[in-house]
């Protein structure tokens, strides 16, 4: 909603359509308009990749999730994260609610290895000390 308030059109897509059900109502409450697309279409100036992740940044609110994460599941998530990044636009904001480096800085580094023309403009790990759940954000652009 914050991006929509900046004046440009905002389009939302999730592989699980159920996760997008409440987006228009939530955006309207925030004074914004967000178009929901069941399948991504067209070319976008920037893509926010809210990648599937372990959710380790929110384990303080759901500690049982910590015990469900296995090495195999982490590897599966990392593979999905790579696929999300590889399908990106000319400018990408990559985000997870994870504190785990394999899902964050390691994914960005692997992406840059696969796509050498990309540079990272911003990279930050937000922790509980920042006043919320754990979160990671990297801004990437074609060099």
Language model features by range: what are they?
Residues 1-143:
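S-adenosylmethionine
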